[in-house]
């Protein structure tokens, strides 16, 4: 896979030289290139922004430096020349980046990240880029950062770690949070007793079937407590009886293949009507 990142702060991307991402670059699994947007300016001040039309606060990133930078990146496209690279524009106005999207993007030949700053990039750049790229504005969440670089670090790691050969034990990718729409189960290591807290006995039993079932039920419990919104989207159509029972104990019923949370009955923590 080839990844290109365009930013006015290329040094911000230095962490991509470390850990598994850095090793993937060394091993030839990942070809990652960081480009300084200011290298594509033509004035002596190397300016990349100007005041917004229509007034308002802040500055807007100018179109021409971006067009020059993206044209250069597009000319160096990887893989099938007929297949457009994917241009990801980190933005709080983009679609939510998820583990499912990370898996989808891990199958692409080339990704390009455009790190905006200030009030954003001139919208005409996005319109122009659609002729040369598959444009995907994306957001890490419902909050605002100073620029796209932090989001690029997170997205790149989430995507690259899914490439074959990057993570040493591929099974760890299968069992982690969000891989199946649920949060990961709790994990423990030695010693088995620590400050009067014990490791759950089932994990010491050696019974792999019971351990797998316990872990699955813990996934349901943790997801219900921390991210109940994920259970609302969870495909429950083919769950075994033990899973349905565990979810029932948490207040969830399977209805038409989806999970529905039962309202608490009066006397169980919910006030009675009237």
From Swiss-Prot:
Principal subcellular localization: cytoplasm
BP terms from Gene Ontology: tRNA N1-guanine methylation
Residues at which S-adenosyl-L-methionine binds: 116, 140-145
HAMAP family documented for this protein: TrmD
Quaternary structure annotation from Swiss-Prot or TrEMBL: Homodimer.
UniProt xrefs under PANTHER family: TRNA (GUANINE-N(1)-)-METHYLTRANSFERASE (PTHR46417:SF1)
Compartments reported by the entry: Cytoplasm
Gene3D superfamilies registered for this protein in UniProt: 3.40.1280.10, tRNA(m1g37)methyltransferase, domain 2 (1.10.1270.20)
Enzyme class: transferase
Homology family: Belongs to the RNA methyltransferase TrmD family.
Organism: Arthrobacter sp. (strain FB24)
Function of the molecule: Specifically methylates guanosine-37 in various tRNAs.
UniProt EC number: 2.1.1.228
Swiss-Prot/TrEMBL catalytic activity: guanosine(37) in tRNA + S-adenosyl-L-methionine = N(1)-methylguanosine(37) in tRNA + S-adenosyl-L-homocysteine + H(+)
Gene Ontology molecular-function annotations: tRNA (guanine(37)-N1)-methyltransferase activity
InterPro entries: Alpha/beta_knot_MTases (IPR029028), tRNA_m1G_MeTrfase_C_sf (IPR023148), tRNA_m1G_MeTrfase_TrmD (IPR002649), tRNA_m1G_MTases_N (IPR029026), tRNA_MeTrfase_TRMD/TRM10 (IPR016009)
Cellular component annotations (GO), alphabetically ordered: cytosol
Protein name: tRNA (guanine-N(1)-)-methyltransferase
Keywords: Cytoplasm, Methyltransferase, S-adenosyl-L-methionine, Transferase, tRNA processing
Pfam families linked to this entry: tRNA_m1G_MT
């Amino acid at each position: 896979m080839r990844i290109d990142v365009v930013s006015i702060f290329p040094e911000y991307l230095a962490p991509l030289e470390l850990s598994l991402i850095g090793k993937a670059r060394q091993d030839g699994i990942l070809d990652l290139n960081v480009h300084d947007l200011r290298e594509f300016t033509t004035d002596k001040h190397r300016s990349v922004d100007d005041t917004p039309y229509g007034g308002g606060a802040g500055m807007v990133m100018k179109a021409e430096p971006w067009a020059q930078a993206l044209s250069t990146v597009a000319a160096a496209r990887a893989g099938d020349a007929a297949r457009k690279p994917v241009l990801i524009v980190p933005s709080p106005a983009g679609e939510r980046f998820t583990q499912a999207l990370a898996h989808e993007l891990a199958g692409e030949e080339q990704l390009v990240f455009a790190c905006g700053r200030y009030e954003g990039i001139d919208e005409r750049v996005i319109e122009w880029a659609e002729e040369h790229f598959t444009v995907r504005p994306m957001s890490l969440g419902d909050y605002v950062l100073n620029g796209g670089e932090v989001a690029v670090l997170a997205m790149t790691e989430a995507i690259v770690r899914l490439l074959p050969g990057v993570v040493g034990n591929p099974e760890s990718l299968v069992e982690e949070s969000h891989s199946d729409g649920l949060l990961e189960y709790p994990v423990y290591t030695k010693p088995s007793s620590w400050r009067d807290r014990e490791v759950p006995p089932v994990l010491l039993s050696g019974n792999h079937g019971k351990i797998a079932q316990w872990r699955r039920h813990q996934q349901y419990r943790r997801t219900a407590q921390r991210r109940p919104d994920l259970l609302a989207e969870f495909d429950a159509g083919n769950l075994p009886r033990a899973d349905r029972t565990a979810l029932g104990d948490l207040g969830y019923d399977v209805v038409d293949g989806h999970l529905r949370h039962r309202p608490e009955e009066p006397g169980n923590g919910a006030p009675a009507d009237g």
